[in-house]
Amino acid sequence: MDKKIEKLCEKIGLGIAISIIIIIILFFNINEVAFGEIILYDTLPNYRINEEVKDIFNKDETIIVSNIDNSEEIGDIELIGIDDISYEHEKTDEEVKKSNEVSNSNIDIKKLENLDYLRQEFYIIDASTGMSKDYFDINKFLSADLKIEKSEDEPKVLIFHTHPHEMFKDSNTNDINEGIVGVGTKLANILEQEYGIKTLHITDSSFDMVNGSLQRNGAYERMEPTIRKVLEENPSIEMVIDLHRDGVNENTHLVETINGKPTAKLMFFNGISRIMENGKLNNISNLPNPYVETNLALSFNMQKRATEKYPGLTRKIYIKPYRYSLHLKPKTMLIEAGAQTNTKQEMYNAMEILAELINDVVFS
């Protein structure tokens, strides 16, 4: 009898042990998925976190999931904290499709108070950053003082190009004025001649060159001393525009017909000096930008005006970490007009509309 009881106990003990092992295996498998995703999300700037995992770690009013799944290099991980992360990677078709989704021209302000709805309608959020209510407050955006008095005597607007060698489909690559610099000249001329807004245009072509070779890395650092000096010498300047063109797949054409003309699409770009770490948005302490809120208010109001007036002209606002050139003045904009697959004329047509929007939002 004792032997039977002993054997029974051994079986029960073995069963309990097996059950415990199974529970442990299941526990670690589940957590490996969840925490593995968080690790990938925090480590790889473009890893899209699973929605269920997001819900575990997202308990406040912060959206930490990207609404794109792009293909930027993992090498950017090593550059976190450097103010020159390239955002001009060749975008995937899916990313371009997302950014080209047209916002509803009948804007419902009340709905935009919901952070998730605001994101869906207006923004593309890079996976290495996120949105929080303190920065993305629709009521603050709408009440922001963005107005500037016009002047034909003193410059009010500064236009420059951190990447001046960006070219277009039909550009003569040997002539700097055939690329984005020439587009900046067009914008400056329209602002002055049609709207009476004195504008200074910097055509320095050295920012993205090192020893005679094209070098985008470090362009923002090389740009800043020159532009800082210009701003010090021209204290009347209140609005700064860093004008770029995007980089997309060669089969992508960012164009919309506006006023009967083929017009390159515009995309407003914001770096918010915040990065996602361990499921939380943290300030990037060595890249301070005291003007983030005004930057965001300006791009939002430009996007809103464009959506109301010219549906389809603008892509969604692109949000990334870091600060780029956006810390130079409160009313600073980084704008990507068209891409390398657009023609010069499509770009010039876009400048007519961009100048109109600037006048509407800032100078009227």
Where do the PLM segments sit?
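Hydrophobic membrane-insertion alpha-helices, especially the h-region
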Residues: G13-N29
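Solvent-exposed loop/turn segments at secondary-structure junctions
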Residues: P164-M167, S205-M209, R245-E250, I272-M276, ...
